[in-house]
Every structure is written in structure tokens, then in C-alpha cells.
């Protein structure tokens, strides 16, 4: 994080290309192209810059799919970005990244989240400080070991060229991060998560970021290809809404990206792109023992060595 030699133009070009590749692939899979919403911040707003949101709602397969690119700058890092680095509080910053969340309609197809980003903190008279962050995680409604192993093995393969220790380190980080403390339960089966990362220097750290971004489609599309035609009914949709409620709770209470966006004066529509189209809550409800719904909690929403 102290190496100030970096090339933000290369990072920007990669991220814009990644968004386009993923959006095209998702549109082809769904049968409906993702719409494009290009935006820029206006004069006098807290942030400068802009981005592009690719969005699909009520598609053939995806009930909601959003993938956003943003490149914004501000005069002071928000508290969520400088909490672990108080020495950077108050610095100017540039933040650029791609973030996506996909909510399939079929409850047997998992929700997925992926994010890759770069932040640069600046202060007049001092060298800029940069770091990378990101990862991907899977949130099944109904658990399948085959799917969990495929997802985690793809994540592990993406990180292996950069050090055998990275996957177990980033997996634990993900398990710890995507956890609803007030519920004492995991959001999903995890994946990988990293932040404040530049320890390999700019070139290798950027290569690692690209490897993670490039691994998204092969990590996810084979899973939903297997499950997309699985029959379901009202019971499964009701449980899906219940689990989506947990997703909403995490994103609004704990997620650093959501908090960063809201605290920095970000674009609300883009920040809340991760929200499911429907969600539900039931008072003190618990699935019956021995059901697939109970099995999700006992066998999948616990840290496991999936890879």
C-alpha cells in the first residue's frame, strides 16, 4: 500500500472491458440484453466522475441482474474506507471498480456477488497511496455440494499463480466478512474476499485482480446452467424471499461498499443495485428438521473446506 507507482488508466480500461464481457455473457445466457445507463455527477455534487450501470429486470432467467462500473473522486475518504488506516483520514481519493449482484428467479439457482476495485488516496506534497480490493461469494437458497466445490475451486485456481497462501487467507476473510453478527449466521457459502491489498506491488497485484475478475463467469455460469430448469413452486419461492431478507440485512447494515457509497455521497441507484427485487421476513421462523431448507443452515451456512 506504500508503493506509489501505478497506472490507473490500465486499471480503468480493464474494468470497463470486464463489465462489457460479463454483461454480454449474462445477456446471452438470459436471452435478454442488459440495458445500459451511463451517468455523470453534476457540478456542485460531493463526488466527481461517473460510470455505467448495466441492468436487467424481469428477464427470462434473472429476476434482477446488475453490473456497475464507476470511477469517482472526492475530497475526503469516507469513514468506512479509512477506518483501518486512520493516517489516511481526510485525504482526497479516486475509487474505480466493477460490482455485480445477480438474483435468478429459480430458487435452485444461487445469488452471486462479485466486486473488483482500486482506491487511490492523495494528499498534496505526499506520494499517493493505492490498494486493490474485491472478491466473489455465492449465496445459495438450496445447497448443492457440487456447486459449492466448483465455485471455490475456481476461486482457488484464480489465486494460485500469486501464492498458495492467498486462497485460504482470502477464503477465511470472506467467511468472516459475510457474516450477519446479529443473526449469528453466514450470508452464504463464501468464496474469496480481500481489501487493502498491494503487497505484491502494482503489476502483480493488478494481475491478481484481473485473474479474480476473469474467473467470475467460469465460476458461476456452469452452476446456473445445471440448475436453471429445476422445477420449483410456491414453497421454494417463499424460502427464497426469506433468505433474500438476510441478504438485504447484510447489505444495509454491514457491507463496506454500500456504506462507502452512501457516506461519500454516491449514486443511490447504483449503490442499491445489489438489492433483490423481492424479499420477506417471518417472525421467529425456523425450517422443519430434515428438510432441504434446514439442511442449508446446518450443512452450507457454516465454514467448510470446499476446495
Swiss-Prot record:
Substrate binds at residues 99, 115-117, 265-267. A divalent metal cation binds at residues 103, 113, 152, 182. It is found in: Cytoplasm. Gene3D superfamilies: Coproporphyrinogen III oxidase, aerobic. Pathway: Porphyrin-containing compound metabolism; protoporphyrin-IX biosynthesis; protoporphyrinogen-IX from coproporphyrinogen-III (O2 route): step 1/1. GO terms for cellular component: cytoplasm. Residues 247-282 are annotated as: Important for dimerization. Belongs to the aerobic coproporphyrinogen-III oxidase family. Involved in the heme biosynthesis. Catalyzes the aerobic oxidative decarboxylation of propionate groups of rings A and B of coproporphyrinogen-III to yield the vinyl groups in protoporphyrinogen-IX. This is Oxygen-dependent coproporphyrinogen-III oxidase. The gene is hemF.
